[in-house]
Amino acid sequence: MPVSARAGIVVTGTEVLTGRVQDANGPWIADRLLELGVELAHITICGDRPHDIEAQLRFLADQGVDLIVTSGGLGPTADDMTVEVVARFCGRELVLDAEVEEKIANILKKLMARNPAFQSALDPGTFESLRAANRKQAMVPAGAQVLDPVGTAPGVVVPGKPAVIVLPGPPRELQPMWHTAIQTPAAQQAIAGRTVYRQEMLRMFGLPESGLAETLREAEAAVPGFGQLEITTCLRRGEIEMVTRYEPTAATAYAQLTKLLRDKHGDQLYSEDGSRVDDLVARLLAGRRIATAESCTAGLLAARLTDRPGSSDYVAGGVVAYSNEAKAELLGVDPALIETHGAVSEPVAQAMAAGARQRFAADTAVAITGIAGPGGGTEEKPVGTVCFSVQVGPPGATARSDTRTLRLPGNRLDIRERSTTVAMHLLRRLLTDA
């Protein structure tokens, strides 16, 4: 797919380079660029040393990119060198922006006024020393457009070939600045050659990647214009995400591909608009009251269900019943049931779900009990054995249910995360059929 505007990303910070902090900015900026029709050439990560930062800038310039976006290194400390390096790279002097310096000073005053521990710093003499220490953040490349700070660090956009957008490292500061940064004249000129395209996401669950790959090979011959579709797939939490980018002229080809996938994998294709299973479950739970009973996942499912505003409208509560005694005392599971079938069994999962419905007066419940490892497995029930029970019905009454046992692959973390995904999909299916 021909795309003329190209960009590169430089993520700075020794803490990111060494893995102490996971990079959230690179992927986020990449998504925003792709949404704009800008081809992403490279994402590079380097430490805080100036010559390393400059080397990354020169590398990207040598690749012929039209735009470089950097994140990090805009603070007041000695190792925050990104703006200085970018100025040198662009052949521009650093100058003090008095207006920005005043804005930073006002931000500092407000922050300190809200924190009693810093009240003494508001003394005029002390504050002036602090203000001077932060003055570095108001030094910007001559001719650059300054982006108002969200924290205390302003961003800058430096015109040129390539143009450079310099953004702070904390995502909570970087993301609000992005829209303003990309709308600046320098950034718009840099990406003027971008291709207008559409991007769609399909989500599938229960379909192996090999199965999707086989269908896509079939589509190459069966779908006219298939070659105009840029398709990427990603396996995440046991699901397949398929992202397709295409120019508007290839819309018919995409529609035919979607129909082929729907015809062959309709049971596994659960989202055609990019909605996550969490989104779908939240909608399906409207007007209901759900409770969870978890053993091996230790509250991860409850956390996932409540990881959105408004979840208190339908989440009643949850129980983490890790021990057999907790299953009996908190969920009313008969100890004889555990003795006969074992804690990791379908009868116990059913009893846990019924107990959760009863305890929270809920009409919907999900129970998970399993062996996440690395120990605890047996020949009959190896590590990765997980039992699920989803129930829909008034507490104390007979409920519609789906109870099953699965063997999930991976390490302890993988098994626990996959278990929550399976539970969400079992819940989605049962509620959809309600």
UniProtKB/Swiss-Prot annotation:
InterPro entries: CinA, CinA-like_C, CinA_C, Competence-induced_CinA, MoaB/Mog-like_dom_sf, MoaB/Mog_dom. Pfam families: CinA, MoCF_biosynth. NCBIfam families: cinA_nterm, PncC_domain, PRK00549.1. HAMAP family: CinA_B. Belongs to the CinA family. This is CinA-like protein. It comes from Mycobacterium avium (strain 104).
